[in-house]
Regions:
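N-terminal leader/linker segments that initiate helical-solenoid repeat arrays
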Residues: 6, 20-98, 113-114
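Bacterial N-terminal signal peptides
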Residues: 7-16
Length: 115
């Protein structure tokens, strides 16, 4: 009986320790993730994509893809806007298309039901 109690105690202790090491929705650097998500979102709401894009890029690098599906959707929208505005610069346009396809792939991997 004593061995069972000790085994249950150790199991409970190990399970409680794993939750301490979990990173949560916003990843290891959650403060910066939330900050950059907030910054880009405010500019995005105003359709000020030029000001929104640098903060979005920082959010995309800092946050895990599972932090916000809207981060991926908004990024796709901003990249499409850049593609339209830079139709004459073929090299830049190809790089933007590659970025857009990467965003779509990341979204399909993390949100397969919603694609």
């Amino acid at each position: 009986m004593k061995k069972i109690v000790v085994a249950l105690f150790i199991t409970g202790l190990m399970l409680s320790c794993t939750s301490v090491f979990a990173q949560g929705k916003y990843g290891a650097d959650s403060a910066n993730c939330i900050k950059y998500l907030s910054y880009y979102k405010e500019y995005y709401k105003q359709q000020n994509y030029k000001e929104s894009l640098p903060s979005w890029r920082k959010a995309y690098k800092t946050c895990p893809p599972t932090a916000s599906q809207n981060m991926l959707l908004d990024g796709s929208s901003m990249i499409r806007n850049l593609i339209e505005n830079n139709a004459k610069n073929e090299t830049y346009r190809k790089a933007l298309l590659d970025t857009l396809m990467t965003l779509h792939n990341v979204r399909m991997q993390n949100y397969p039901r919603l694609v």
